[in-house]
Design a protein with these regions (language model features):
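N-terminal Rossmann/SDR dinucleotide-binding element
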Residues: 1-71
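SDR active-site strand-loop-helix element
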Residues: 6, 30, 72-76, 112-118, ...
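Conserved Rossmann-fold NAD(P)-dependent oxidoreductase catalytic core, especially the SDR/UDP-sugar
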Residues: 74, 100-140
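Short alpha-helical oligomerization interface
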Residues: 81-97, 130-135
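Conserved beta-loop-beta element that borders a ligand/cofactor-binding pocket
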Residues: 116-117, 149-170
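Active-site Tyr-X1-5-Lys
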Residues: 123, 136-159, 187
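C-terminal substrate-binding subdomain of Rossmann-fold SDR/epimerase-dehydratase oxidoreductases
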Residues: 190, 194-312
């Protein structure tokens, strides 16, 4: 099987590429390298991995990358509320324009697996978010991912995943993600400050994220042209609960702030039963993530912990 991974040098992408190569797949990565490509360097010893430096906004680069691919995993994106607000034009160009290039250039027989986002749901006060609910994104990021979802589904032969917020170690580590950020603060500043601790979020380990993409490829016949929430009920937590678990394990100070508020207003609990009914289960727990991040952050030195944010 030949798989194209856009954004394959990113936080999720480089973990996914490892998994694909372990299966014996031929993998092509299309990435603009807005972040360093060093995480892919050890993998390039494998002759089944091909790297193409290019941008999904470049139609010719996309057409070249698609040649010979059986499956496309479209990860390339400007990710998250802060990054999209910082450069709204780029966010739309990459998240929507890049997806449009991909859907227009690929052949009908090429399966697209598209990781979208639970950010599409916005804020849901009562009940669990299901795939049947009408999305109400509150941020530009959520709006662009929802628009990209619709482009992918309109063309058909696609599987859309709406993943929870990722956490855990990756060769291309992101410390802007809520869990990872709390861990960084706990270990480096000795305290976690939490705004609006009652807000609900859902989480998924980056390795489970990659496993779910592999699951979607394997089960494309059953999952085709549908949307699936990706996560686990046990990983639905309030921000306060998450911070308390980290603080208890690491012995840091926990401060609940009543003075400020999080500009990201997402607040939801999510139902993951649709994907679980097909047999997918996450394997990594919050405690697993705390333990591995505590070990991993000992050897990481970043002058700016947010310097590697924004891209998958």
């Amino acid at each position: 099987m030949r798989v194209l991974v856009t954004g394959g040098a990113g936080y999720v992408g480089c973990v996914l590429v490892q998994g694909l190569l372990a299966r014996g797949c031929e993998v092509r990565v299309l990435d603009s390298l807005r972040k360093p490509g060093a995480p892919l360097v050890p993998l390039l010893a494998n002759p089944k991995l091909e790297f193409q430096r290019g941008d999904v906004r470049d139609r010719r680069a996309v057409e070249e990358a698609l040649r010979g691919a059986d499956v496309v995993v479209h990860l390339a994106a400007v990710v998250g509320y802060p990054a999209c607000e910082r450069d709204p034009w780029l966010a739309r160009e990459v998240n929507v324009g890049g997806t449009l290039n991909l859907t227009a250039a690929r052949s009908p027989g090429q399966l697209i697996v598209f990781p979208s986002s639970l950010s599409n749901y916005g804020s849901v006060k009562d009940g669990l978010c299901t795939e049947e609910m009408e999305p109400q994104p509150l941020t530009l990021y959520g709006a662009t991912k929802l628009e990209a979802e619709r482009l992918v589904l309109e063309e058909g032969n696609a599987v859309v995943l709406r993943p929870a917020t990722a956490f855990g170690l990756s060769p291309q580590l992101r410390l802007d993600l809520l869990f990872n950020n709390f861990m960084f603060l706990a270990l480096n500043e000795g305290a976690i400050v939490v705004y609006q601790p009652h807000f609900w979020r859902a989480f998924i380990h980056v390795r489970d994220f990659a496993r779910a993409i592999l699951f979607a490829i394997d089960n494309a016949e059953r999952m085709r042209d549908q949307v699936y929430n990706l996560g686990a009920e046990a990983l639905n937590l309030t921000k306060g609960e998450l911070a308390a678990r980290i603080a208890e394990r690491l012995g840091c100070r926990l401060q609940i702030s009543e003075d400020g508020e999080d500009p990201d207003k997402r607040n939801y609990r999510v139902d993951f039963s649709k994907l679980e009914a097909l047999g997918f289960r996450t394997q990594e727990t919050i405690n697993d993530g705390i333990e591995e991040m505590a070990r991993g952050l000992q050897v990481i030195s970043l002058p700016n912990p947010y310097s590697n944010a924004s891209y998958y």
